[in-house]
């Protein structure tokens, strides 16, 4: 099972993913970096940006541009099987909003959300759920 993730310079999402102890690869932070191409099913883990905009509904851009660029590649998008989102509960209704957006656009299940870098329970629940449901989610690596 592969975890593809995006993390800002705060590295909150990076720390969460490392605690999952699953094979992972990071989407490049800088748009000038070589784009990531994946060739196997994966779960996407990403942070949510722009908290609090649901009050006005304006300028809502919860999905990081690096993730948008990654998913705009049809090849990459064809391998997404589930999404996990991080965020800040101070965002209120927008907490984990990136997961909702990606789930709807890519037609994959939004399986978990965690706050900041996640706690021990988040890691246990998320990892356990992914491992236990890998076959059901289509996250097992396909034979070539």
From Swiss-Prot:
GO terms for molecular function: FMN binding. It comes from Corynebacterium ammoniagenes (Brevibacterium ammoniagenes). InterPro entries: Flavoprotein-like_sf, RNR_Ib_NrdI_bac, RNR_NrdI. The lineage of its organism: Bacteria, Bacillati, Actinomycetota, Actinomycetes, Mycobacteriales. Pfam families: Flavodoxin_NdrI. This is Protein NrdI. HAMAP family: NrdI. GO terms for biological process: protein modification process. NCBIfam families: nrdI. The gene is nrdI. Belongs to the NrdI family. Transmembrane segments: none annotated. Probably involved in ribonucleotide reductase function.
């Amino acid at each position: 099972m592969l975890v593809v993730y995006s993390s800002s310079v705060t590295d909150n999402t990076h720390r969460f993913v490392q605690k999952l102890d699953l094979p992972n690869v990071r989407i490049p932070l800088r748009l000038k970096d070589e784009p990531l191409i994946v060739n196997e099913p994966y779960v996407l883990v990403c942070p949510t940006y722009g908290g609090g905009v649901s009050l006005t509904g304006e300028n809502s851009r919860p999905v990081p541009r690096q993730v948008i660029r990654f998913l705009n590649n049809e090849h990459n998008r064809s391998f997404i099987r589930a999404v996990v989102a991080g965020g800040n509960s101070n965002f209120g209704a927008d907490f984990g909003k990136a997961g909702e957006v990606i789930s709807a656009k890519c037609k994959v299940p939004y399986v978990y959300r965690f706050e900041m870098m996640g706690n021990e329970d988040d890691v246990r629940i998320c990892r356990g759920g992914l491992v236990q449901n890998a076959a059901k989610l289509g996250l097992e690596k396909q034979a070539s």
